[in-house]
């Protein structure tokens, strides 16, 4: 029987590190209001999502990313 479900492919390769200093990468996974996108939307693996969340929170702590984006 054929497999009807497409295998999900993570947008970030599993071996690639997620670094808190890579602000351009982190901004892709934050909403316009500044919230971290959930895993079902990002398509990351659970380990990558945990690493991404840690990196975003660390980047916010050292003021590389804002906690909340102001609405215009």
Swiss-Prot record:
A GO cellular component entry from the record: cytosolic small ribosomal subunit
Entries under InterPro entries matching the protein: Ribosomal_bS18, Ribosomal_bS18_CS, Ribosomal_bS18_sf
A GO BP entry: translation
Gene3D superfamilies: Ribosomal protein S18
Keywords assigned: Ribonucleoprotein, Ribosomal protein, RNA-binding, rRNA-binding
Matching Pfam families: Ribosomal_S18
Keyword RNA-binding: yes
Domain of life according to the entry: Bacteria
Gene Ontology molecular functions: small ribosomal subunit rRNA binding; structural constituent of ribosome
Membrane-traversing stretches: none
Function as written in the Swiss-Prot or TrEMBL entry: Binds as a heterodimer with protein bS6 to the central domain of the 16S rRNA, where it helps stabilize the platform of the 30S subunit.
Subunit relationships: Part of the 30S ribosomal subunit. Forms a tight heterodimer with protein bS6.
Family from the record: Belongs to the bacterial ribosomal protein bS18 family.
PANTHER family to which the protein is assigned, alphabetical: 30S RIBOSOMAL PROTEIN S18, SMALL RIBOSOMAL SUBUNIT PROTEIN BS18M
Full protein name: Small ribosomal subunit protein bS18
Species classification: Bacteria, Bacillati, Cyanobacteriota, Cyanophyceae, Oscillatoriophycideae
């Amino acid at each position: 029987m054929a497999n009807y479900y497409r295998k999900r492919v993570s947008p970030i390769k599993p071996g690639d590190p997620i670094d808190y200093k890579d602000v351009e990468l982190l901004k892709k996974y934050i909403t316009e209001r500044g919230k971290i996108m959930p895993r079902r939307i990002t398509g990351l693996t659970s380990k990558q999502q945990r690493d991404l969340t840690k990196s975003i929170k660390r980047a916010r702590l050292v003021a590389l990313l804002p906690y909340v984006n102001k609405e215009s």
